[in-house]
Amino acid sequence: MDKIEVRGARTHNLKNINLVIPRDKLIVITGLSGSGKSSLAFDTLYAEGQRRYVESLSAYARQFLSLMEKPDVDHIEGLSPAISIEQKSTSHNPRSTVGTITEIHDYLRLLFARVGEP
């Protein structure tokens, strides 16, 4: 399976969108403020991946974890179970981005500092 297919996503700002995302690649979601970038990344894709991961655990292990709400979507295919590196509450800084809030920006800087060529 080389793609993630989403059909009928209606979480928060998303209005019944359909999309195909390539797997095993670094994907950037861009758009205007309020266009549903975080709704797609966190509330749809991550929530469904994390929900599938928790469902794969034993009943004993699940009692210690909170299950995320199932996203309002018709169909998601090709999505792997997901866990987050670190989860923080959002800041109220208007200059914050998904990259700075999730600290993925820091991880990417470390990665490219090691493997990048000047």
From Swiss-Prot:
Binding residues for ATP: 31-38
InterPro entries: P-loop_NTPase
GO biological process per UniProt: DNA repair; SOS response
Protein's cellular compartments: Cytoplasm
Plastid is among the record's keywords: no
Main location: cytoplasm
Gene3D superfamilies noted in UniProt: ABC transporter ATPase like domain (1.20.1580.10), P-loop containing nucleotide triphosphate hydrolases (3.40.50.300)
One GO cellular component term: cytoplasm
Keywords: ATP-binding, Cytoplasm, DNA damage, DNA excision, DNA repair, DNA-binding, Excision nuclease, Nucleotide-binding, Repeat, SOS response
GO molecular function, one term: ATP binding
Keyword Transcription regulation: no
Record note on quaternary structure: Forms a heterotetramer with UvrB during the search for lesions.
Family: Belongs to the ABC transporter superfamily. UvrA family.
PANTHER family per record: UVRABC SYSTEM PROTEIN A
Main function: The UvrABC repair system catalyzes the recognition and processing of DNA lesions. UvrA is an ATPase and a DNA-binding protein. A damage recognition complex composed of 2 UvrA and 2 UvrB subunits scans DNA for abnormalities. When the presence of a lesion has been verified by UvrB, the UvrA molecules dissociate.
Protein's UniProt name: UvrABC system protein A
Native species: Proteus mirabilis
